[in-house]
């Protein structure tokens, strides 16, 4: 099948960057450069496509320009025509492709290769430290209809039962949204450990994480989101890829995620508990700030794609999602890499 490079996507994703709503002040210690500019390459192959397959559908998460990153598309290489879509719940953008019979039979050795290349500038996302944020703290206010989804449960992030009980225990003595979030942050920082041994970790199952008290970034941030939502505080899940702090190029092994919560006077405030746990000297920094050593691809859990997938909602959306004849298909080879460039 012929490879097409969709240069028109340059116009779809490069938007004027907004100004940051708040900058780090001199009293917020910075550990990394405030910006990083790099080429990001997202490559994968759908392999072993059955020759009798009639339809292969592919959804690819696409980073987008916002206050914290500026994204330019350098190239999209795909075996068929793709189109940009956006799901309405969280606003996540994606590329969508369909391979249909007889194109499937004509594909090389039953596989389909996709490569997306970007130039990205990522900026530090800073709201200040806890002392600064506490000055304008208020009790959680009535949530607008547009934010109601962000106080509702997800499949693996309940807001009742054990998570509600934990919220009462951990945050109940605090009144403000910032103070409650800090109590939840401190509890998870102290009581969990970053540990990817064995099974169960990586799904972001808030109840499992509270019982096991270990896991990766999804497991740290799911109970945080659940406790805050149980208190009526909007909270959301962000996911993308990490950039090694002391390297200027190389492969990226897997995803990274963090969280945000909403305070009435300040707006959205980021936290990264798992990174704080791995670098204890950054415990204070990662409440209210996240560094530029990352790129965000999507927001949210229980994600319904556009066009809608036949399978269930996705737990999170950072890797390509593929269906063959209406069923999820996971025979994929994936590779992600970056290279620093001068801005």
At which residue positions do the language-model features occur?
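Positively charged n-region of N-terminal signal peptides that target proteins for export
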Residues: 1-5
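Bacterial N-terminal signal peptides
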Residues: 7-19
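Intrinsically disordered, low-complexity N-terminal segments that are enriched in acidic
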Residues: 23-126
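Sec-exported extracytoplasmic/periplasmic mature domains
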Residues: 50-51, 63-67, 121, 168-175, ...
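Acidic low-complexity segments
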Residues: 87, 113-194, 200-211
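Active-site nucleophilic cysteine motif
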Residues: 177-184, 213-228
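Hydrophobic/aromatic-rich core segments of domains that either
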Residues: 222-310
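Low-complexity, Gly/Ser/Thr/Pro-rich intrinsically disordered linker/tail segments
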Residues: 290-343
């Amino acid at each position: 099948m012929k490879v097409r490079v969709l240069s028109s996507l340059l116009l779809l994703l490069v938007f004027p960057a907004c100004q940051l709503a708040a900058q780090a002040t001199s009293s917020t210690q910075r550990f990394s450069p405030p910006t990083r500019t790099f080429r990001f390459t997202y490559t994968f192959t759908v392999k072993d496509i059955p020759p009798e397959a009639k339809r292969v559908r592919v959804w690819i998460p696409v980073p987008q320009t916002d206050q914290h990153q500026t994204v330019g598309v350098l190239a999209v290489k795909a075996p068929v025509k793709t189109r940009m879509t956006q799901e309405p719940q969280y606003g996540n953008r994606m590329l969508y492709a369909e391979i249909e019979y007889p194109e499937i039979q004509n594909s090389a050795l039953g596989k389909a290769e996709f490569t997306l290349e970007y130039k990205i500038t990522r900026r530090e996302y800073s709201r200040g430290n806890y002392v600064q944020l506490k000055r304008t703290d208020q009790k959680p206010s009535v949530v607008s209809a547009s934010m109601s989804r962000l106080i509702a449960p997800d499949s693996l992030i309940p807001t009742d039962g054990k998570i509600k009980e934990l919220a009462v225990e951990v945050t109940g003595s605090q009144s403000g949204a910032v103070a409650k979030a800090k109590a939840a942050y401190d509890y998870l920082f102290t009581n969990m450990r970053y540990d990817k041994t064995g099974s169960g970790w990586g799904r972001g199952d808030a109840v499992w994480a509270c019982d096991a008290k270990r896991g990766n970034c999804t497991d740290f941030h799911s109970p945080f989101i659940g406790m805050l939502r149980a208190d009526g505080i909007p909270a959301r899940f962000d996911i993308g890829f990490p950039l090694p702090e002391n390297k200027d190029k190389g492969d990226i092994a897997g995803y990274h995620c963090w969280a945000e919560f909403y305070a009435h006077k300040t707006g959205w405030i980021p936290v990264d508990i798992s990174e704080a746990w791995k670098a204890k000297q950054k415990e204070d920094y990662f409440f209210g700030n996240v560094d530029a050593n990352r790129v965000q691809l999507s927001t949210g859990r229980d994600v319904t794609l556009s066009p809608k997938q036949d399978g269930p909602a996705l737990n999170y959306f950072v890797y390509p999602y593929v269906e063959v004849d209406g069923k999820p298909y996971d025979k994929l080879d994936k590779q992600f890499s970056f290279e620093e460039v001068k801005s």
